[in-house]
């Protein structure tokens, strides 16, 4: 089964929805075959390189949206920090720190449905500074934006825009009611139209089914995104998803491998929640189709030491892009 599937994908043909759906029912004693297939596809399209990105929570809390997983939503009582846009100096310090520690990309992430014009002007100024004073690839995650803002970001030096779908269209209403799935899709399309690469993925462990994950993967394939962040839910006290169990490590790996087979040319990026969900199996993700990591801290939770991730990459005889 997997030999033929790998040959098909390497030749430029695509895995079908039904084939991807069937991976959810694969017996656990055959998961190593799935992981090997994902590794072979990954090596064919990307070699042995791993992309490392980092973020700064540039404006935190008081978001108007009701995303059920989010610590920064103003609809829920959580312990997430609340502060306005960080200063240029604070952001430059964090960017330089992450560059010195091995990150290749750096993103400003701001809470909220979108970004105000006044904050947007400040963000453009910050990106121009980062372009001049660092060698980092610059990414932005500023919520829902249109074509005009995307163009201005590109002109300021941003190369990639991040905006998650979060889940598939059919499950999205269970997760958010204050904006639509289509608004997220339109943001992705606007960024692409402006000439930006797009980083878009979602969160697994929200209560969605395997079919929902496959649907999300095919949505992303249709949109032609360059990078697919996979986050694993870490339930936050005070949110509607508090108390949900963590996904089993093998379920995370199964999902990552499926995304690799559906999106062979994209970066499959393991992000928030990987430490808690995968525990000691994090290296196995890089042998099961994953070829990118978010390093350092996340928005409201701590990551592990960047040095530990770099050692993991080196121990697997992989190289940083």
From Swiss-Prot:
Keywords: 2Fe-2S, 4Fe-4S, Biotin biosynthesis, Iron, Iron-sulfur, Metal-binding, S-adenosyl-L-methionine, Transferase
Catalytic activity: (4R,5S)-dethiobiotin + (sulfur carrier)-SH + 2 reduced [2Fe-2S]-[ferredoxin] + 2 S-adenosyl-L-methionine = (sulfur carrier)-H + biotin + 2 5'-deoxyadenosine + 2 L-methionine + 2 oxidized [2Fe-2S]-[ferredoxin]
Location of the Radical SAM core domain: 45-274
Disulphide bond pairs: none
EC number, as in UniProt: 2.8.1.6
Classification via Gene3D superfamilies: Aldolase class I
Pfam families: BATS, Radical_SAM
Keyword check for Mitochondrion: no
Cofactor details (free text): Binds 1 [4Fe-4S] cluster. The cluster is coordinated with 3 cysteines and an exchangeable S-adenosyl-L-methionine. Binds 1 [2Fe-2S] cluster. The cluster is coordinated with 3 cysteines and 1 arginine.
Cofactor field: [4Fe-4S] cluster; [2Fe-2S] cluster
BP-aspect Gene Ontology terms: biotin biosynthetic process
Binding positions ([4Fe-4S] cluster): 63, 67, 70
Segments crossing the lipid bilayer: none
Pathway linked to the protein: Cofactor biosynthesis; biotin biosynthesis; biotin from 7,8-diaminononanoate: step 2/2
Binding site for [2Fe-2S] cluster: 139, 199, 269
Domain of life: Bacteria
GO molecular function per UniProt: 2 iron, 2 sulfur cluster binding; 4 iron, 4 sulfur cluster binding; biotin synthase activity; iron ion binding
InterPro entries registered for this protein in UniProt: Aldolase_TIM, BATS_dom, Biotin_synth/BioAB, Biotin_synthase, Elp3/MiaA/NifB-like_rSAM, rSAM
Family in the record: Belongs to the radical SAM superfamily. Biotin synthase family.
Role summary: Catalyzes the conversion of dethiobiotin (DTB) to biotin by the insertion of a sulfur atom into dethiobiotin via a radical-based mechanism.
Subunit description: Homodimer.
Protein name: Biotin synthase
